[in-house]
Amino acid sequence: MKKLFSIALVALFSCAALAQEFPSRPVRIIAPFPQRGLDVSSEQGSRLRDVSVRDAAVAPVLLAQASVPAEPFPNRALRIIAPFPPGGAADIVARTLSQPLSRAFGQSVIVENRPGANTAIGAEIVARAPADGHTMLIIAPSFTINPFARPKLPYDTFKDFAGVTRVVSNAIVIAVHPSLPVKSVKELVALARARPGELTFGTASILGGQRIAGELFREAVGIKIVNVPYNGGAPATTAAMGGHTSMLVSNVVESAPQVLAGRLRGIAVTSLVRDNVLPDVPSVAESGYPGFEALNWFGAVVRTAPKPLIEKLNAEILRAVELPEVKDQMARQGMSPATMSPADFDAYIRAEAQRNERIIRTLNLKIE
């Protein structure tokens, strides 16, 4: 009897390919004979002999699946979409990461610049890419601004993307023309309150991280100042040096050379602590507004993909950012490592978006 059952069981296993469907309950492989010395009733024996063809047939399928190795990742070239023009900070971040990532993965890493629409053009490319982790997008604060400032985005910021990590961050500088009679946040606030609505602050765009930082500063200190947007950081800096705007709210990379040369006066940085590039310029937080922080940052996201792939990308970017040559390159741009886990970065993106939504709706700001 035992021999007969063994033959039948082997036959069932060999018929796995003929199974019509997967089992609707957990797979069981049951020996229908009691162990020696074990008293089994006829009812129990009947249950033990109830072996379904479907249960037995699926076992070799599962074993075969378990023995097949997972497809390696990445299995082709990686793409990094930088939704900014060549030569800018985001482009530098992408290209600086590309070399160590290429070495780590043994694949080419191609950087593509796709500027336009406040980074929405590049984001759309990634949103439509295969959900396999092979196409990354370098994002900045504008990624968390667009959902509320641009009507009818061709993607869903919070459903179509998954955070990999924040990569680096840098401070934003509040600077004034040397002719303005202020040398501190306290003096700037006093002057602005004495002349409500007269002082202006220039930014690199109508609605980006610098504009948000300027509005957060205005709100925190309780003054009325007017934004003057420019098409880029260079013209905004030039306007401030020429006295066409009262203040400049700009990335430390763009404004630090002018502050160090005395062509602009640094009033404060928006990081929690002083920036290494401008160690003599205090933070807003230490100038009487504890906890104030408004950073410029760059991170990496992919189209929503399996968690193991995202974690692998995260691990390699974290390793890359700690390499001395990468740190040096980032430091030359005034940027410091600011990495996170994928889950923390997703939460950070949502927190930034929630804050930006409040500012945008309060001021009724739009990007047409």
Task: State where each predicted segment sits.
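Positively charged n-region of N-terminal signal peptides that target proteins for export
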Residues: M1-L4
